[in-house]
Amino acid sequence: MISQASIKSLSDILDLESSNFVRYIQEVAKLRPSRSGDAEAIALFEELYQDSSSNITELSALLADHAAVFPQVSWDMDSARYNFLRPVFLLAPLTDSFRDDIGRLDQLAERIVEAGWEEAQQAVDRLRGQKSAALERIESLAQKLGGLESDPPERSGSSASRW
């Protein structure tokens, strides 16, 4: 029998993946590609988004047998500051987000391991491995494009305050 704690933990992992920063980038942020490197960053974001969608499908299928769970998507209001930026400027926050997600995954996976839920444990291990590989790709692209780009523009005040 699978414990309620492990079901809750897997549900929390589903919520974490559903609220992934790359999903925010693809679904909400209106990116402004304009220079070299932007196309590479956008291609990476699209690939990571597809991976995330596959992960959500897999986790939802595992949970469907045990509970009626729907992903709870929640993005930090602070993420709005990333709207309308060039894609290359989102690589650093995406790196930080993936690092945080991996750490959170490790915490949430403990209850699944303790319960001995083999299928869920394998899914979480795949997700962790996928996120680690993605983190390396993001860092590699950020390093490659880092020399080409300057710091992102600083926003101070609203557009009305600059009139």
List the model feature ranges, each with a label.
Residues 1-163:
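Iron-associated oxidoreductase/ferritin-like identity signal
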